[in-house]
């Protein structure tokens, strides 16, 4: 069977990573604008002030999307571009930009998918406590209301939060990302709970103010788990490990269940409640009802996974990777199996249609003497991973796949040192070059994965 006729093939980006124009068009500052002003925070002190200059070049970029056959494009709205302080006055210039982008996409028969939050927390909200401030639930709700009012006449697909594991864990536990803090564990659980409530309020606002029926989802991340063999006990071990909370305290955010059980099952996992009881904020029935506001689809960002088997003691154990295990340029393991087992386990537990909202590879791409960008490693990666996804499509309700990323961009703490794109960006000239993988992806889309 493979992928259905309605399967959505797309690519994804986020606002700060590509837009540039950080100080233009009435935009307010967000935490990444401020964070990157401090030397030593990002590789080689890179910033996103210009990035891919997509703010000025979006029409060219949409033409490139069409040239590689994209059916859909997932992008984030910069909260601080449309509401500079995060609350209060609306910036109409920002609204105009996103309206123009949406219209250009639709003119080129590319379906827009909007992510409300991909880490651009308005700095004025951060100064008021950010995710620690319970008011953020209503501020985020008002922002979602604005998005619904201005864009939902044309855009029907939305994801609320992108990778809350990252913006809480990397931003406030390890300090690797903006705002670069290392706060007490207790504070991170409060932030996480507020973020989950903000998600629920956003779902409510999108439903209430949408100008047509909307498809609303959520896009967390996590390393998936896959079994060493297809023996029943290894499969069960991988499933148990995926939904357990095995991480040490400083990495507690890197799990699936804490972030997805409340949204889709209506409660936090019992294991986590017991383990972290002393760190938890007050959690009410009203909170849980809000967090569990019904969504339509489940998005998951998947890049790699851990191989698991059932140990001799009857407990799941991770299988150590062999020396020389294949890795991407950024150092992430290459584990195609995760794109079969991950969606399968998620669908079995949560029962919602699944989108792969991000998946891709960083490679050391260069422009060759012939003026082209030959990236056979990316083509090989995509072929291996999508072959596994095709297996999953035979067994579960799988709706779409968004390759990360449309184009090379500002890769957070790595700056411009990592290239994930199907399209090469020369940051000195802003020239774009479609990589070999972009053409491979186009051909794969045309035959709907029949060649995998």
Question: At which residue positions do the language-model features occur?
Answer:
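Active-site region of glycoside hydrolase catalytic domains
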Residues: 1-42, 85-87, 95-452
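A common structural microfeature
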Residues: 6-8, 55, 72
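Catalytic domains of carbohydrate-active enzymes, especially glycoside hydrolases
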Residues: 57-78, 293, 297
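Glycine-rich, proline-tolerant flexible connector loops at the mouths of alpha/beta enzymes
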Residues: 77-90
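N-terminal, well-ordered alpha-helical segments
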Residues: 56, 63-66, 96-99, 103
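Aromatic- and Gly/Pro-rich amphipathic surface segment
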Residues: 29-63
């Amino acid at each position: 069977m493979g992928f259905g006729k309605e399967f959505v093939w797309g690519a994804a980006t986020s606002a700060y990573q590509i837009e540039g124009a950080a100080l233009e068009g009435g935009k307010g500052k967000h935490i990444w604008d401020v964070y990157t002003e401090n030397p030593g925070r990002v590789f080689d002190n890179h910033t996103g002030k210009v990035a891919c200059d997509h703010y000025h070049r979006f029409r060219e970029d949409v033409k490139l999307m069409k040239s590689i056959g994209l059916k859909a494009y997932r992008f984030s709205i910069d909260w601080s571009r449309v509401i500079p302080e995060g609350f209060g006055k609306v910036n109409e210039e920002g609204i105009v930009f996103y309206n123009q982008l949406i219209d250009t996409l639709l003119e080129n028969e590319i379906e827009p998918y909007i992510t409300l939050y991909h880490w651009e927390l308005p700095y004025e909200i951060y100064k008021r406590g950010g995710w620690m401030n319970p008011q953020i639930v209503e501020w985020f709700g008002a922002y979602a209301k604005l998005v619904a009012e201005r864009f939902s006449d044309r855009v029907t697909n939305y994801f609320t939060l992108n990778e809350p594991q990252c913006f809480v864990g990397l931003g406030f536990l390890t300090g690797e990302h903006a705002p670069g803090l290392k706060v007490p564990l207790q504070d991170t659980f409060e932030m996480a709970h507020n973020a989950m409530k903000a998600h629920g309020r956003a779902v409510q606002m999108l439903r209430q103010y949408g100008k047509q029926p909307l498809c609303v989802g959520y896009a967390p991340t996590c390393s998936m788990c896959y079994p060493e063999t297809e023996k029943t006990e290894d499969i069960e071990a991988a499933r148990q490990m995926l939904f357990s909370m095995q991480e040490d305290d400083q990495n507690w955010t890197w799990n699936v269940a804490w972030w997805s059980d409340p949204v889709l099952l209506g409660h936090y996992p019992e294991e986590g409640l017991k383990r972290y009881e002393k760190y938890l904020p007050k959690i009410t029935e009203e909170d849980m009802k809000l967090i569990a506001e019904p969504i339509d689809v489940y998005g998951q960002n998947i890049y790699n996974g851990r191989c698991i088997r059932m140990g001799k003691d009857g407990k799941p154990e991770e299988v150590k990777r062999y020396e020389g295990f294949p890795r991407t340029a950024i150092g992430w393991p290459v584990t195609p199996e995760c794109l079969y087992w991950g969606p399968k386990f998620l669908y079995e537990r949560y029962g919602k249609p699944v989108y792969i909202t991000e998946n891709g590879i960083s490679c050391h791409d260069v422009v060759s003497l012939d003026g082209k960008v030959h990236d056979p490693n990316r083509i090989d990666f995509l072929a291996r991973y999508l072959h596994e996804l095709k297996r999953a499509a035979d067994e579960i309700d799988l709706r779409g796949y968004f390759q990360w990323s449309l184009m090379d961009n500002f890769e957070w703490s790595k700056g411009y040192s990592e290239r994930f794109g199907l399209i090469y960006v020369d940051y000195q000239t802003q020239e774009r070059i479609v990589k070999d993988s972009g053409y491979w992806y186009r051909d794969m889309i045309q035959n709907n994965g029949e060649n995998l």
